[in-house]
Amino acid sequence: MTRVLKAKKRKAQSGETRSAVVFLHGYGANGADLMGLADPLADHLPDTMFVAPDAPERCGAGPFGFQWFPIPWIDGSSETESMDGMARAVADLNAFLDAIMIDHDLLPEQVALVGFSQGSMMALHVAPRRPDALAGVVAFSGRLLAPEQLPDEVATRPPILLIHGDQDDVVPVQSLPEAAEALEAAGFAEVFAHIMRGTGHGIAPDGLSVALAFLRDRCGF
């Protein structure tokens, strides 16, 4: 049985929802952490609803945040616990996305994922394995997990934008070209990348501007 994800929502500014951006937060954070990104985006995406779920588990490394799955080198969990946790979170997120589409009468091509760090890892894992292609994925400061499995498991190939800070000391910037190479090897025709100069493990204004352009031009929002 999947777990129901609690989420913050911001209605479409125009009053008519024609698309949705689902923010997926990083390890130890919560949905509210990324919902602030809706402020600079909403004026440019008036028909877009913004949704930011909390990950399904309390963070093992701290009492206040959430995690999509355990990270062994941070919280002392085992590799098996981490893999099992991710499998459960994938099912939870897929159920959440299905519910968003049903509740708001949206098609998969009207829904985009915007992730940060561990949330990006979830987005890059979930989107290609869904049977109907989502509008796109924006992955800030993440990595593609189990790239060797992707060619055999990919079901759809939505446009993907990878964004990373060149000073990231949490998830190395080399994760970006590694993900791009694996995606292209798996047949993804639309893989875009942007490096945020002088940026650590975070989201800089230039990265957000590129994400906005992607959502408008490639996702049709």
Which residue ranges define each predicted feature?
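Serine-hydrolase catalytic machinery in alpha/beta-hydrolase-like enzymes
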Residues: M1-Q110
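Short, proline-enriched alpha-helix->beta-strand connector loops that line the catalytic pocket
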Residues: R18, E109, A155-I160, A189
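Short N-terminal helix/helix-N-cap motif within the alpha/beta-hydrolase-1
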Residues: G31-A32, E148, A204
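Short alpha-helix in the alpha/beta-hydrolase fold that links the catalytic acid
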Residues: G36-A38, P172-A182
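Alpha/beta-hydrolase-fold catalytic nucleophile elbow
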Residues: P53-D54, V114, V138-S141, I163, ...
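Primarily recognizes the serine-hydrolase "nucleophile elbow" in alpha/beta-hydrolase
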Residues: M101, E109-T156
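Short beta-strand/loop motif that positions the catalytic acidic residue
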Residues: L162-H164, D168
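C-terminal catalytic histidine-bearing segment of alpha/beta-hydrolase fold enzymes
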Residues: P177-F221
